[in-house]
Amino acid sequence: ARLVLEEFDENPFLPDFYKDPERYGFQTQLFFLLQRYRQQQELRQVDMFQKLLLTDYMFVKDRLFASLNLNEKEMYLYDKVANLLEKNVIKPDLVIYLQADTDTLMKNISLRGRDMEKDIASEYIDALNQVYTEYFFRYQDTPLLIINTSNIDFVKNSKDLDEIINFIRQPITGKKFFNPLSN
C-alpha cells in the first residue's frame, strides 16, 4: 500500500495560528487546502504497483477546521476556492473515522508532544470533535466505518490493532460502527 500523510509540518503558518488563531486562521487553512489539493493531484498519477492507497485525512478535513477558524468573509472566499478544487479530488473507497471523546483526544495530543500544540484549548478540540461528529452523522458519499477509540490504544497495544484490522477486513457497505473494548 502507498501511504500518504498530512504534511502539517510544512505549513509555515501553523505555529503562528496556535498563538493567534484569528490573525493566522485564513493563511493556515488556505495553505492546508492547497497542500491537500497538490497531494490529491499527485495521487491521480496511476501507480501500477500500488493497488492500495491509504491517507490519514480526507480532502474535506480542512473545510471542517475552516468552519471553526474563519470568520464569515474568510469562509466565503475559502469556500469559493475549495469548491473549484474539490471537483478534481479522488473519492475514497472507504472512510475510517477514528472517533474519541475530547479527554482522549487531549491525552493523545499531549502524548505526541508537538511543541506548537502544547497550549491547545480543550474547548477548541471539543468544538472540532462536534464538527466531525455532525459531519459523519450526515456522511453518505462512500462506505464509512466509525471506530470508537476512546477505550483502546491501537498504537501501543497490538491486540487492539489486530481487532481493528480484523474488523476492517470484513466487507463494509453503508455506515458501520465498531466499538472495541480495551484488551
Language-model features: where?
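Conserved nucleotide-binding/hydrolysis micro-motifs of P-loop NTPases
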Residues: 8-11, 59-61, 100-105, 151-154
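Glycine-rich phosphate-binding loop used to anchor ATP phosphates in small-molecule kinases
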Residues: 24-90
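A glycine- and Lys/Arg-enriched "phosphate-lid" helix/loop adjacent to the NTP-binding pocket
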Residues: 62-133
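Hydrophobic/aromatic beta-strand patches that form the interior of the parallel beta-sheet core
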Residues: 4, 55, 94-96, 145-147
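NTP-dependent small-molecule kinase module
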Residues: 110-118, 126-183
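Conserved substrate/cofactor phosphate-moiety recognition/catalytic segment
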Residues: 1-35
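Short aromatic-enriched loop/helix-cap "lid" or pocket-rim segments at secondary-structure transitions
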Residues: 14-17, 66, 107-110, 158-160
